[in-house]
Amino acid sequence: VETVAPFKEAIDAIKEAGGEAYKLCYQCGMCDTVCPWNRVRDFSMRRIVRQAAFGLPEIEGEDIWRCTTCGSCPQACPRGVGTMDVTVSFRRIASEAGIFPPPIHTTSVNLGAEGNPLGEPRSQRGDWAKEHSVKPFTEGMEILYFPGCYPSYDPRLKKVAAATANILNRAGVDFGILGEKENCCGESIRKAGDEELFKRLAKENIKAFIDNGVKKILVSSPHCYHTFTNEYPEFRANFEVIHMSQYLLELINAGRLKLTNEYKKKITYHDPCYLGRHNGIYDEPREVLKQVPGLELIEMEEAREDSLCCGGGGGRIWMETPKGERFSDLRLQQARGVGAEVLVTACPYCIMNFEDSRLSLEDSEAIEVKDITEIIQEAIGEEKPDKDGA
């Protein structure tokens, strides 16, 4: 009994941390076949699940921190094993034991102190909006725009928040932001294993939404969309949530947004993991892009359910990935391979990783990386003044 007890305790800890899915696994190895890591280095999700089954989690190794939670393995699994849940359970156990990569520790500190992973002042969260006629949210407004952390602070991603605001203003949408009242949604730090910090961030956000009379939330990030839609209900919070790619289609179909300018470029669309595989949103972004005059949409071979992860999920966006192991480099090659001039996506993490990969190219101008809102902003053009000059 004495030799079995430690393993049983570990198994109980894994179950308590949400990793009980290992019980369904019969070690067929399909997860390893589809995992993007195996395109760039050896990695076995099957081995991690096996460790869970035997109560022998290797929480001090690097492997438990590699998973990007892209969703490819549960999609391919014939038994429907939630392999990502097993990985996250290992991370929770490791975090509780004080074992985690330094970047994750730094991020947790930043989130706890300022409500964002960058450690930027909370008081400046809404500063991006000052030049774009964006009002503070008040009860009764049509929608709350929740840009997320990186569009609020990162110089490249601020352009996405600005494009979104400009589009909403052009469409006559009555919207506002909460600015410094917002926290990070908490999705990625939860997947990185810090469950208690996630709960704190989520509860503070939910309180801010309720206190300000929020009913409908518009998001730029699929990670925010996923968390608000699928995880905040754990706290009995149910708000209507819509991703900008979906809302764009609604505005266009309702006649509130006119795409009049031609965009004569060949583009390809990258399905973000948390918009596509995790939430099934594939058609709306494509329907929006198809309505842009002059735009030619070319599909990559790995599209929709088979989309190649950019490498940013599961907390990996905060960790350095060595050159030669970046999924985003492979994705950029795929985009160029189909003759695309622009790689379009709808996720801040994807844009960050693709921009880094683009800048590492010998000819970094060979392809552009854009958010779908930036394309639509160009398609609606500048607002023309009334004939009387008003």
Question: Where would I find each of the regions flagged by the language model?
Answer:
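Short cysteine clusters
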Residues: 25-31, 35, 67-73, 77-78, ...
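Short, structured patches in soluble enzyme cores that scaffold and shape functional sites
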Residues: 147, 243-245, 271
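Iron-sulfur-cluster electron-transfer modules
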Residues: 19-22, 39, 49-220, 225-232, ...
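A broadly conserved sequence feature marking short terminus-proximal activation segments
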Residues: 1-3, 23-45, 277-281
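Ferredoxin-type iron-sulfur electron-transfer modules in oxidoreductases and energy-metabolism complexes
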Residues: 2-17, 38-66, 70-72, 80-113, ...
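Cofactor-cradling patches in redox/metallo enzymes
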Residues: 151-243, 274-291, 296-390
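C-terminal amphipathic alpha-helical segment
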Residues: 253-289
